[in-house]
């Protein structure tokens, strides 16, 4: 399951939900007919409950959405704080040179001289750009996910090549 965001609050009295998205293109979520909700983002697939998306629209830096089965504010309050996710195959295909964070986590990171720098353990959104969290044992490197440093992402080979030195 790919975690997309989190329900942060009810929105109004008719069951609408305010969503904090974790990615940079939450408008693409409208293409999905169903969303899945869970209390624990790392829980088993069986813990995710499927909801049909009735409506979704941008709101500020996030989204507001209406799910079937959430008819009023009380029902919305009952699922506040839940994570929003979707199976990878339910997600819209990313554009060229765009990636879902979940597809990058676990990839090996090497530099231009083929030195292994570690493995992507997560990403951080800083507002200006995303940052790869690369772990190698006890060492963590934070590498900006921008063209100046990220030279190639090869999902098939499960490798990211970067312009970064091991001792930085």
From Swiss-Prot:
PRC barrel domain ranges (all copies): 96-168
GO annotation, biological process: ribosomal small subunit biogenesis; rRNA processing
GO molecular function, one term: ribosome binding
Cleavable signal peptide: none
Keyword rRNA processing included in the entry's annotation: yes
Keyword Magnesium: no
Pfam families linked to this entry: PRC_RimM, RimM
InterPro entries referenced in this protein's UniProt entry, alphabetically: PRC_barrel-like_sf, PRC_RimM, RimM, RimM_N, RimM_N_sf, Transl_B-barrel_sf
GO cellular-component term (any): cytoplasm
Compartment(s) of residence: Cytoplasm
SUPFAM superfamilies according to UniProt: PRC-barrel domain (SSF50346), Translation proteins (SSF50447)
Assigned keywords, A-Z: Chaperone, Cytoplasm, Ribosome biogenesis, rRNA processing
PANTHER family named among the record's database cross-references: RIBOSOME MATURATION FACTOR RIMM (PTHR33692:SF1)
Similarity remark: Belongs to the RimM family.
Oligomer and partners: Binds ribosomal protein uS19.
Cited function: An accessory protein needed during the final step in the assembly of 30S ribosomal subunit, possibly for assembly of the head region. Essential for efficient processing of 16S rRNA. May be needed both before and after RbfA during the maturation of 16S rRNA. It has affinity for free ribosomal 30S subunits but not for 70S ribosomes.
Domain notes: The PRC barrel domain binds ribosomal protein uS19.
UniProt-recorded name of the protein: Ribosome maturation factor RimM
Taxonomic lineage: Bacteria, Pseudomonadati, Pseudomonadota, Betaproteobacteria, Rhodocyclales
Gene: rimM
């Amino acid at each position: 399951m790919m975690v997309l965001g989190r329900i942060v609050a009810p929105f109004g009295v008719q069951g609408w939900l305010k969503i904090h998205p974790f990615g940079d293109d939450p408008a693409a979520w409208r293409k999905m007919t169903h969303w899945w909700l869970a209390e624990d983002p790392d829980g088993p697939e069986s813990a995710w409950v499927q909801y049909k998306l009735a409506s979704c629209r941008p709101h500020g830096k996030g989204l507001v959405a209406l799910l079937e089965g959430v008819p009023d504010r009380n029902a919305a309050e009952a699922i506040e704080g839940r994570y929003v996710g979707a199976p990878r195959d339910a997600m819209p295909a990313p554009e060229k040179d765009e990636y879902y964070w979940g597809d990058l986590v676990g990839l090996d990171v090497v530099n231009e001289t083929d030195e292994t720098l570690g493995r992507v353990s997560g990403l951080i959104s800083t507002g200006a750009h995303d940052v790869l969290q690369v772990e190698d044992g006890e060492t963590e490197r934070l590498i900006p996910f921008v063209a100046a440093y990220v030279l190639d992402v090869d999902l098939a080979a499960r490798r990211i090549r970067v312009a970064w030195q091991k001792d930085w």
